[in-house]
């Protein structure tokens, strides 16, 4: 099965804000026989948190610092393409930057969603983005055109 990693902003958001676009992407991709892999999977308990911390949460092995880093790195390694949603970011995302760097080193195609004026505008983001788009719909259309024959 073809897998798409759904990376994007988590820190500073509520669980719902971090997860809702991913659920939408998973539904659309599944209609095409593509698996959307969310870093938020099996983390529904985070819905009890007010705001998600960049330092993770020590309450669970998946959300402590080592758990986040290790599973996200595994997901990037095992997915076929990386879709990185940076829309609406309020600050630069170190985690998203790391995931794009891993993808680049592994020669994984990347689709970055980012609007003009985004705090993540940086040479490294632009150079690791194989495809730069401004909406989730455009990103999903790009995924489809890359992955389906």
Regions found by a protein language model. Give the residues of each.
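Conserved catalytic or regulatory cores that recognize and/or transform ribose-phosphate-containing ligands
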Residues: 1-149
């Amino acid at each position: 099965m073809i897998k798409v990693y759904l990376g994007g902003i988590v820190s500073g958001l509520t669980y719902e804000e971090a997860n809702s676009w991913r659920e939408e992407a998973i539904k659309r991709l599944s209609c095409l026989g593509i698996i959307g892999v969310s870093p938020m999977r099996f983390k529904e308990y985070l819905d009890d948190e007010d705001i998600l911390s960049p330092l993770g949460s020590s309450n669970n092995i998946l959300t402590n610092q080592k758990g986040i880093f290790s599973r996200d790195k595994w997901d990037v390694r095992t997915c076929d393409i990386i879709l990185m949603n940076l829309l609406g970011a309020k600050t630069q995302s170190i985690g998203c930057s790391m995931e794009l760097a891993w993808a680049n080193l592994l020669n994984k195609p990347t689709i970055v969603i980012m609007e003009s004026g985004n705090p993540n505008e940086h040479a490294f983001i632009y150079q690791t983005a194989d495809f730069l788009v401004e909406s989730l719909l455009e990103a999903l259309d790009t995924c489809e055109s890359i992955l389906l024959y």
